[in-house]
């Protein structure tokens, strides 16, 4: 990657990020300890919105967020920034691989947002994954799932793992669970389209060092991110969780390809400044 980040901006933004995080951590811990369910559900969304502002992330939203509660949101995954963006738009908890729980700072943040940690490497854990997710969904909590199982380079999707859709087979109060595909795409930096050569500034994958990546990202200007909420579906309508996974993968892949090619989105903008820098 060529050097685009500025040291001064990186320093200011990361200090802002640390300040917001230091303020939010004890408040969220207190709300969980005291059983303030409404606060513990809404505070993470406020936190993520503030982080987006601090880091210069401007989000344009297309489509409408599912109003069914709970909803299982499924999204492509290119970066830890996806969590800030989706967390700012959706009241819910994330589903993450178990290793995240032990990460410094980010592991604590994930636990305080009541993230559901799953072991994705063991085939025998499918039933346990379903039970863990089903329990939270039955309790009324919407969940945000990255069915690729890991982050990618932001240019294309990895195959979706149908086993991760097992929780979609449960019924909530006698009704099929709503599953909403969501596409996240990093489209412009300071008004300039983000091409393949610039996407590594935003996508975090493989063996990239987290600290270096975050420092560089914080030093960039205003990043425009497109989030498209597609039409919710159910496993019953599609016949099986495998077909559900294929449907979500195809819908998200098509939208990501359009966004990355600069062809834009056909749906009208619902909130072009849902998270403004």
Language-model segments: residues:
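Cytosolic-facing loops and C-terminal tails of multi-pass membrane proteins
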Residues: 242, 247-277
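A cross-family acyltransferase "interaction/gating" segment
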Residues: 106-107, 154-239, 262, 266
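Membrane-proximal, non-transmembrane interface segments of integral membrane proteins
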Residues: 70-71, 129-132
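Short histidine/acidic/glycine/proline-rich micro-motifs that form metal-
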Residues: 34-35, 123-124, 150-153, 234-235
